[in-house]
Each structure stands twice: as C-alpha cells, then as structure tokens.
A protein has these predicted regions:
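Short helix-loop-beta junction
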Residues: 531-533
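Conserved short alpha-helical segments that host acidic/polar catalytic motifs at enzyme active sites
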Residues: 1-512, 516-520, 525
Length: 533
C-alpha cells in the first residue's frame, strides 16, 4: 500500500479570530475544571463524568478549537506570537486540571487538537518559513504564503500518519500557479533538467517554454512546481517527513516564489511502499510526465506537464508504453510512471483536461487510486479510484479540499468527508473520477463527477480524531495497539452498554452463560486476556 495526500485552496475573505476571545474561552475551561476539581471528592466517577461543569468545559474548548481552525485561525496565530504563547500557557493550565480518570472525549479531543493541530502546527510553520522563534511573526506574509505554508505542514503531518501504509520513500510537490516570470529567481532554471524528478527538482508549465530558453521564460506568467523527495530502505517512522521538512525549509528559491504568489498553492504528497520498482528517489511519488525522449524540452512545451501520485498497481503499464510510444527516463522503474505520461499525452490531444483524464484512466488495468494535476491548469485536482480495495477521502475543510488515502490523513483540517471507492457510501461503478476546483474548494459544488451516471456521495462525519490516531510516545503503531488493548475492550463495552441497562441484572440472575471475545491481530491479544479474567 501507499498513501496519498493533497490539498487545494480557494481565496476567501479571511476573518482571523480575535485571540483574546480564544484566551477567554480557555480561561472559562480552566474555571470550570477548577470547580470540577473542588467537587471531585464529593462526586463518584459516574456523576463526575456527567457534571454540568465538565459539559461546559467541553463546549468552551470546542469553541476555542473551532476559532483556531483553518487558514483564518493559523493566520491569527502567525500574526500574534505573544498571544499565541499566552494561549499555550492557558491550555497548559486546563490540561493540568483534568482528573486522571476523566473520560470525556469532547473535552480531551478539543484540548488535544488545540495543542497539536493548531499551536504546534503554527510553530512548525514559523520555522518552515525561516522564522527561528515565536518572537518572529509572519505579519508581513500574504494570505497565499500562509496558505501554502499551512498546506505544506498539514501534508507533512499527514504523511507521518499515512506511513502505516508504507514508508520506504516519500515525496511532496508544491505547485504555485501563474507567477510573474520576471520576478523568479534565476537560480530556479537550472533545477528543471533532472529527468528523474528527484529531490529539489523544479518544473514549469508548458506555455512558459522553459527548457528551450535557459534562464528565461517565454511567457509573462508561469506555474512552478517544487518537488522534494527522500528514499531509504532502512529508517524509523517519522524520518521521511523530517527529511522533507529540512529540505523545504532550506530552499530559498521556494521562499522567494512564495513571496510573489498571487494565488493559493496546490500541494500533492505521497508515502510509498515499493511493490514494483526499486526504492529510490526516481521511483518516489509524486511522478511527472517527463519521458525518455532524450530531449526533455519537448515535455513542458508540446505537452502539458502533469504531476501524479498513485496508490496501487497499473498491471498493463508495459502494454501502454508500447502502444503509445512512451518510455521512462533512465532510472525510473515504477509502473506508476505511466500515469502522468499517459494523462499528459491525452491532454495534449484534447482541449478538455477532465475528458483527457478519463480517457487515460479508462485505459489503466489493475487496482489503483490516483491524484493528478496539470501545471497548465493548476486550478484543478484530478482524482480517480478503480479496481478493488482502493479509496480516496475528500475532506471538506474551510475554503479547501483535503484529500487522503485514509480518513486519518484529513482529520487535522476537517472531520467531514466524501469517500471515493468501494463501500456502501459510494456509487457502485468500475471506476470513479472527480475533479476538484479551487473556485468552490471546500464545498460540494467544487466537486465535478466525470461521467453522467455518477453522483457525489453523501457527506460522512468521522468518528475519530487526531488524538485517536497519534502514535504518541510509541516507536511503532503495533506497540500503541498492544498498550491500548485494555482501553479498547473498555470502550467497546461502553459503546454497547450503559449504566442504566439490564446488563448487571443479567449477570446477577445467572442468565448469561457464555461471553465470546473476538479479535484480529493485536485485538486478538486483548480478546484472549479478556477471556482469561
């Protein structure tokens, strides 16, 4: 398996929240928890969980988290480093007042999200843009710089979570639409000649005519794609995202281009588990449509430059290469490379990008989920799922779409999503393809189904949060699962029984003769332990 992440944004009238209001909400949480602490000795565990103070604290924490979410919340934190530090201190007060035995997911999830999804994300983004401490704010940065930074950091966090699907290599592409070519750093142009599309590679949109004229472009505007990659056979969870973070934060060309951006960036990222093709940066995704023509100038001039990330296998890739007279650059051996190549060729022969995309997808055999973007049309993100066992989750966030291979890849930004792929929540079809547009990003109106007999699936609300899926202090997710087995049993029982039901009476009356504990994998260990109690 592999993991895909993408985010596409639209411009909006941002209304950053007043951090003083957020601070007051957190102070309210502290006051409610202090009152709860005073009453704790007089209340038993059940009454403590159902107390009015706890419900109020949870509501206030959720309000604070909502205000800090999205680009508006991030902008407020970035522009007010001192107030952000005060929020962190107030949050610590609240966290220290939580009773050890407390099990209130609304409160715990909200406080966790404020700490990790809001404050820590803002701090990491500050460093990503070259700010060394909280005293250096991002007040001089535009909405588009901040939006790109938030998308990049969100992608890196998502890659960490998606590593359970594979981690031998990873990559992240940042697509900046329609930059003024006269303002581009001259050092940028030498980075476009890496046909293997490895770490630090840069690509330009086709209309710019980049490779035919080194150090200058033929158009006034050019879409620029920065790509960063890492590949390692041996490593720890989190190593890849840290390597990408270092590469991105050290790229002065990227910072210069972000400074002149007048539109929101599109970010496409991927973590790989190699099934076909060696573990290398050349085989790491995202992949581009550069071919083995020997004259890379032809790609990016006569054909649209396409970037794609793929999860799954294209079984007929060799046949497609032969039939369409395509070839991989030397060193690229992954079957997925055929995806951007064929999409680019189809787009070259069509004025309709969406139709060209479906024309290419309909030729693929196998089982895969894919996300693609043409640099000539950076306002669209193209998605497709075909074959068995594949899904993509399209998150509906504030002014943006967040896409991932698993729900836990989108949770940092939203808990509302639409599922593409197999399952009762989606359209039954051999393949599904949609286009996401910046114009209505974050809204169902921004999702165009490619095919007359397909409809947008219903919106689903996730039942988990980032607190549930974090690896935390554990080196591996397996260790986390084992350590949380007792809690899993407790939560399972709580979801099926309440203190008011007749379960206790059944046990006392001798009506229960047998209890069956069922589990798979590490859950089987919990089931066995439960059976031996």
């Amino acid at each position: 398996m592999c993991g895909i992440f993408a985010q596409i944004r639209r411009s909006a009238n941002l209304r950053p929240p007043d951090l003083k209001q957020v601070s007051q909400l957190l102070q309210g949480v502290v006051e409610q928890l202090q009152q709860l602490s005073d009453d704790a000795n007089a209340l038993d565990a059940d009454l403590l969980q159902e107390s009015v103070e706890l419900a109020r604290a949870a509501d206030l924490a959720q309000q604070a988290n909502l205000l800090l979410s999205g680009l508006a919340g991030f902008t407020a934190l970035a522009n007010n480093a001192e107030l952000a530090a005060e929020l962190s201190a107030g949050l610590s007060q609240a966290e220290n007042l939580i009773p050890a035995a407390l099990e209130n997911p609304q409160l715990l999830d909200a406080l966790w999200s404020i700490r990790h999804d809001r404050l820590q994300t803002a701090n990491k983004a500050l460093k990503l843009l070259g700010s060394s401490s909280q005293s250096n704010t991002l007040q001089c940065l535009s909405e588009f710089q901040l939006g790109a930074t938030l998308s990049i950091q969100t992608a890196l966090s998502a890659l960490d979570r998606l590593e359970v699907r594979g981690r031998d290599s990873a990559g992240l592409s940042i697509i900046l639409p329609r930059l003024e070519t006269g303002q581009l750093p001259t050092s940028l142009f030498s980075r476009q000649y890496d046909d293997q599309f490895t770490n630090g590679s840069v690509r330009f949109s086709a209309e710019a005519g980049s490779r035919s004229a080194p150090a200058r472009l033929q158009a006034d505007l050019a879409t620029v794609c920065f790509t960063y990659k890492v590949a390692a056979t041996i490593g720890k969870l989190g190593d890849n995202s840290q390597a990408l973070y270092r590469a991105i934060s050290a790229d002065s060309d990227l910072r210069e281009c972000l400074a002149i951006a007048q539109e929101h960036a599109l970010v496409l990222a991927h973590t790989r588990w190699a099934s076909l093709g060696e573990i290398s940066q050349a085989n790491a995704h995202p992949l581009d449509s550069t071919s083995a023509s020997g004259r890379p100038a032809e790609v990016g001039i006569s054909r649209p430059l396409v970037i794609a990330a793929v999860n799954g296998d294209i079984d007929n890739h060799s046949e497609l290469l032969a039939n369409h007279d395509l070839a991989f650059p030397t060193g690229v051996t992954t079957d997925s490379k055929v995806v951007p190549l064929l999409i680019s060729k189809s787009a070259h022969n069509s004025d309709n990008l969406a139709q060209a995309f479906t024309t290419a997808v309909e030729q693929f055999e196998g089982s895969a989920a894919l996300a693609a973007c043409s640099l000539d049309n950076p306002d669209k993100l193209l998605l497709s799922v075909f074959g068995s066992g594949q899904s993509l989750y399209v998150g509906l966030a504030d002014d943006s779409f967040v896409v991932a291979s698993e729900p836990y890849g989108i949770l940092e930004q939203t808990n509302k999503y639409i599922r593409l792929g197999g399952g009762k929540d989606t359209v039954k079809h051999a393949s599904e393809a949609v286009t996401l547009s910046t114009e209505n990003a974050g809204k169902t109106e921004g999702i165009a189904n490619l095919g007359s007999n397909r409809t947008v699936s219903e919106i689903i609300t996730a039942e988990i949060t980032t607190r549930d899926v974090t690896r935390g202090k554990h080196a591996h997710y397996l260790l986390k699962e084992i350590s949380q087995s007792p809690l899993s049993v407790s939560k399972t029982l709580q979801s099926q029984a309440s203190p008011e039901n007749v379960l206790a009476e059944l046990f006392q009356g001798g009506k229960v003769e047998k209890i069956v504990a069922i589990g798979q994998g590490t859950a089987a260990i919990a089931a066995k332990a439960f059976a031996e109690i």
